[in-house]
Each structure stands twice: as C-alpha cells, then as structure tokens.
Amino acid sequence: MSFRKYALITGSNSGLGFGIATRLLQFYQPRLQDEPEVFTVILTCRSREKAEDACRRLKEFFPDRKIRLEYVLLDLSNMASVEAAVQDIATRFPKLDFVYLNAGAWDLEGIQWLKAIFSTLINPIQALTHPTFYKETAGRVSNDSLGYIFESNVFGHFYLKNRLAELKVLRSSTKVVLTSSLVAEKKSLDFEDLQCFHGEQPYQSSKRLLDVLHYAELEKGLPFEQYLVHPGLCTTNMYETFLGPILVMCAKLGFYICRLLGSPWHTISPYVAAFAFLWTALHATKEDQSIKWGAAVTRFGHERVLSTPVELILPSEQEKALEYMTKLYQEWKKKLVS
C-alpha cells in the first residue's frame, strides 16, 4: 500500500534506539482495532534473541494498539553482516521512509577518578557535558581489520545507507538521521588516522568524523534527505555496561544537578532524548539539513529541540574524509557483492 510508511532503526533493542521506536509507535500506530495499520517499525539487533525481546517489550508497552514490528539482524562491526542486512531489507521492504542510524559502540577502559572528582566540583556542567576523565581503549581493531569504533559508529552505517540508496530502497523523500554527539570535538579527529588506530579518543573521533562527512555529503548532494541529530546526555546501556548500576545512579544524580543549574543538554532518559529524533521525522524540512540538532530540556525536564554549534570544518577536511570513505566503500562493495 502506498500510504504505508516504514522506519528502520539500528541498535533498537535498548537505549536511544528503543526510545525512538517507542516514540514513533506512539505517534503513528492506531488505537482502534478497526483502523488500518499504516506504519512498520523495523528493528535491527545483533542477535535474534535481542530482537525478539525488543519486539515483545514494545508490544507489551502498547497493549491497546495495533503494532507492526519487523526485525533485521545486523552487526555493524562485521561488514559481511552489514551486506547481508542490506539484502534482507531490500528483499522484504519496498522502501524506507525514515532511517535512524543510531547503533554504535563505546569502549571504555577506565575512569581517571581524581580528574573526575575535581573537574566536577569546579565546573559540574562542563565536566559532565564534555568529560575529559574517561579513558577509552585505544587501537582496537575489528575482525575486518578496521578500527573497531570507526567501523561500528561510522563506516558500517555509511556502507548500509549507500547500498540501500543504490538498490532504490531509499527514495528522494527518505529521511536519514545520523546520531551525532556533544563530544564530536575537532581536536579528537586526526585526518591522517581517520580510523583512529593510534588515537586515544576513538569514540569522539568517530562522532567528529560523522559530522564532517554529513556536511561533505550535503555539499556534494545526496539522493535522500539527511539530518544530523544528537541525543544530549542520556544514560543508556553503554553507561550501564561500563560503569555498573551504582555509578550510573551517581551519573544520573550529577546530570539532574546540571539540569537544575541550567544545562539544556542533560536529557538523562533515552525516551526524552528520542524527542529530537521524532521531531526530525515529523517536522524537519530540507533547510534543516544544514543544522546539527540536539535533544534538550528545560530545568524541569520539558522537552525541546535546539540547534548545536559545530566547530569549523574546512572544505579540505570535507573532501579528504569523503574521498577516504568513498574509496573504502568501493573496496568493501567489491569484496562483498558478487
């Protein structure tokens, strides 16, 4: 049916991805059993068990609504899995109206506690918005011999969207939403080491590269609409995996304090953070593609969307990043597509 809409959300079994799925279903799915289904949400997860669990929880969350959920298996750190997902999506779905490229990885090695304590006491908003006390695992390489964080956060999605565009699953009206970050800082990205094999901040590097690529692609021209959005600062499963429940509670307390002190970016809840991603689907126009949008809140938690400054990106940086990614894409496409 031509009126049916399809939304693909990567990394949707928990955290922000699950929040985005919840928001979309709340808005689109009918309550009455005799109303037609017009919206399909396609979840991507690494395993069948996680996907089926996410579908079950979403259905339990909306007991009085007609829910249409599908899932695709996808591991962004495995390029063979990415190509398999491309083929699965192209075979099963005629088009995609919304594509949320949300899944990603963060590899935390530890916390510099003295630095964390003193920086938080001196300037809590700065310390908990742009933290400098996390120590990331440097130099991790995937089984594809790519930078693990680079592949998981940038290249896997770059390959996915370009292949889907080639197969005409993405149309001119499709809205592709990239998940950026507040920590996408210029200093973290080395253009001589775009995969961050040698850098100490692979996560920040990957998010800055994502920003650079977005503007490079807009400049060149895309066959679909593409938006750059970040979730503010919310506590997801990545926090819980590395910090544990007690430290996550402490982090949430710190985030609430920052919010009361006036920080707009401490969204805390993935559901609240997902508001900006829903707004993009419903209200963003082509003119909004040039702005980096962010999920934000008032002191008392009222949701809003704010534009976010992006540090200067030079034309030469855009050109170098896009040329590198395009070449890598062609290399992997040749390997994976018979």
Swiss-Prot record:
One of its GO terms (molecular function) is 3-beta-hydroxysteroid 3-dehydrogenase (NADP+) activity. It catalyses: 3-dehydro-4alpha-methylzymosterol + NADPH + H(+) = 4alpha-methylzymosterol + NADP(+). One of its GO terms (biological process) is ergosterol biosynthetic process. Pfam families: adh_short. InterPro entries: Ergosterol_Biosynth_ERG27, HSD17B7/Erg27, NAD(P)-bd_dom_sf, SDR_fam. The active site is at S180 (proton donor), Y203 (proton donor), K207 (lowers pka of active site tyr). Heterotetramer of erg25, erg26, erg27 and erg28. Erg28 acts as a scaffold to tether erg27 and other 4,4-demethylation-related enzymes, forming a demethylation enzyme complex, in the endoplasmic reticulum. Belongs to the short-chain dehydrogenases/reductases (SDR) family. ERG27 subfamily. This is 3-keto-steroid reductase erg27. It comes from Schizosaccharomyces pombe (strain 972 / ATCC 24843). The lineage of its organism: Eukaryota, Fungi, Dikarya, Ascomycota, Taphrinomycotina. The gene is erg27.
